[in-house]
């Protein structure tokens, strides 16, 4: 069976995006390289990789609505929600029937991130 290798998203500022994901989740760079004019960093998101691509002239979040979100199980859910509050990042908390919550917010480039208190 095939498995997920990585999810790639465009960002406006690679360095700021790397800092954002490191400060919130502790995600670390596992590889960085260039491809033509694009600067690319791969970050370990625990069980997969998120590819951040900074390419001159490319929009960050897709304007056509074909992109939904990336969902992450976060064992430090409450801590991360508190960090979002500290940074003034707007969020939407959604209570689940299993006694846990989901939290939706946007990264620096408008990509929607969902954090899950418990796995499904």
Predicted regions and their residues:
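Residue-level marker for the onset of beta-strands and adjacent loop->beta junctions
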Residues: 5, 38-39, 68, 99-101
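N-terminal beta-strand motif that seeds the catalytic metal site of vicinal oxygen chelate
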Residues: 1-15, 68-72, 119
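Core segments of cupin and vicinal oxygen chelate
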Residues: 2, 9-50
